[in-house]
Curated annotation (Swiss-Prot):
<dbReference type="GO" id="GO:0097730">
    <property type="term" value="C:non-motile cilium"/>
</dbReference>
<dbReference type="Pfam" id="PF00085">
    <property type="entry name" value="Thioredoxin"/>
</dbReference>
<feature type="site" description="Contributes to redox potential value">
    <location>
        <position position="40"/>
    </location>
</feature>
<dbReference type="GO" id="GO:0008340">
    <property type="term" value="P:determination of adult lifespan"/>
</dbReference>
<dbReference type="InterPro" id="IPR013766">
    <property type="entry name" value="Thioredoxin_domain"/>
</dbReference>
<feature type="active site" description="Nucleophile">
    <location>
        <position position="42"/>
    </location>
</feature>
<comment type="function">
    <text>Participates in various redox reactions through the reversible oxidation of its active center dithiol to a disulfide and catalyzes dithiol-disulfide exchange reactions. Shown to facilitate the reduction of insulin disulfide bonds. Might play a role in the reversible nitrosylation of cysteine residues in target proteins, and thereby contributing to the response to intracellular nitric oxide.</text>
</comment>
<dbReference type="GO" id="GO:0030425">
    <property type="term" value="C:dendrite"/>
</dbReference>
<dbReference type="InterPro" id="IPR036249">
    <property type="entry name" value="Thioredoxin-like_sf"/>
</dbReference>
<keyword id="KW-0249">Electron transport</keyword>
<feature type="domain" description="Thioredoxin">
    <location>
        <begin position="2"/>
        <end position="114"/>
    </location>
</feature>
<dbReference type="InterPro" id="IPR017937">
    <property type="entry name" value="Thioredoxin_CS"/>
</dbReference>
<keyword id="KW-1015">Disulfide bond</keyword>
<protein>
    <recommendedName>
        <fullName>Thioredoxin-1</fullName>
    </recommendedName>
</protein>
<feature type="site" description="Contributes to redox potential value">
    <location>
        <position position="41"/>
    </location>
</feature>
<feature type="site" description="Deprotonates C-terminal active site Cys">
    <location>
        <position position="33"/>
    </location>
</feature>
<feature type="disulfide bond" description="Redox-active">
    <location>
        <begin position="39"/>
        <end position="42"/>
    </location>
</feature>
Length: 115
């Protein structure tokens, strides 16, 4: 399942699929956080992801439960959790694997400054 982070209202579930989200925002960076509810490192980095989503409104932050979204995991070749895929118009332009807080923060800042 794809969840778009809307931290004012916590998490907003999309009824539509990822392709519709891309069509609605073709020029925006969309960051996909591939996580699992049982994953310790995913839980550890979740507060930072929430902080980044709250701070950087020009980027769309989504969470993808790997146990419910095998199609997206396959599309983006996700092999571990957490994995962060930065996309533009549906194409992966950057990927980070693991609980890499400093790298995640740096990549988000790079993409914000490039907009």
């Amino acid at each position: 399942m794809l969840k778009r982070c809307n931290f004012k209202n916590q998490v907003k579930y999309f009824q539509s699929d990822f392709e519709q989200l891309i069509r609605q925002h073709p020029e925006k960076i969309i960051i996909l956080d591939f996580y699992a509810t049982w994953c310790g490192p995913c839980k550890a980095i979740a507060p930072l992801y929430k902080e980044l989503a709250t701070t950087h409104k020009g980027i769309i932050f989504c969470k993808v439960d790997v146990d419910e979204a095998e199609d997206l995991c396959s599309k983006y070749d996700v092999k571990m959790m957490p994995t962060f895929i930065f996309t533009k118009n549906g194409d992966a332009i950057e990927a980070l694997e693991g609980c890499v807080e400093d790298e995640l923060r740096q990549k988000v800042l790079e993409h914000v400054s490039a907009q």
